[in-house]
Amino acid sequence: MLTEEIKEYIGTQLKALTSIASPTGFTKNATDYLMKQLEAMGYAPQLSNKGNVSVEIGGVGAPLVLAAHVDTLGAMVRSIKDNGRLRPTTIGGHQWSTADGENCMVFTRDGRMYTGVVLNTEPSAHVADEKVEIKEENMEILLDENVNDKQGVAALGIQTGDIIAMDPRTVITESGYIKSRFLDDKLSAAILLGVAHAVKEEGWKINRKVTLLFTVYEEVGHGGSFVPADTEEMISVDMGCVGADLGCTEHMVSICAKDSGGPYNYELVTELSNLAKSEGLDYAIDVYPHYGSDVEATLHSGYDIRHGLI
């Protein structure tokens, strides 16, 4: 049973995870946090060479992997412009239209962090004759530093390849609504931490072997490319979609039947929908035409598993 204590725990973990900048390729701080949290619960998590965190939380037989990712969309410094602004390149499927005017952070390789703002190259309606199209080549990072040339930026230690992360702006309202960047997929990661917490603290019983997997390259397509060899089923726990002709709302369990990688395992989707129905959960089975998940990377790596996405 999902108690108020577990809900509060999940909310606390969500705030902690979103406060850690982790665009794909820059996830060590996030995985260090996961390792410490799981170890503090009494588990023995493992960190792969790639950076994924996995942990067995109990049960015997019919091994199941539940996967969530802690890497996020973001950007990288592509070059330093003559005017001291940074030209970015996207990490993952980042949409610049959602970031124009957003506060951001730039992380250098020697451990420094600078704040700035994402702007298009002609942000002022009082100056520009025409609107600038919001696309990558028209975006730049204006640092909160008194620099106006390449040399000034270089003196800060900023260089090509440095990571750019957007302000998460996480808010959990009194009515229980969550507003934040990077709910894809840090909310799912927080939920899986909540499951691990409930097993230890509230005695949740597990009737099969369950491994939680926190991946770090989902946003670029290969996060779930390695899982325990005995895995029989794997379910990606990722963001649900709302919109267009989909049946799901923000208040429902979302079960994906098909995405850009094709159909999910028919029998597993059926079992998930039957389980939701038997437990009285409000749910929808939907098709996501422009979606991909960790478990598809697992299949492409040659694993013989049944796969699902919720």
Can you say where each PLM-predicted feature lies in the sequence?
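N-terminal hydrophobic/helix-forming segments and targeting peptides
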Residues: 1-309
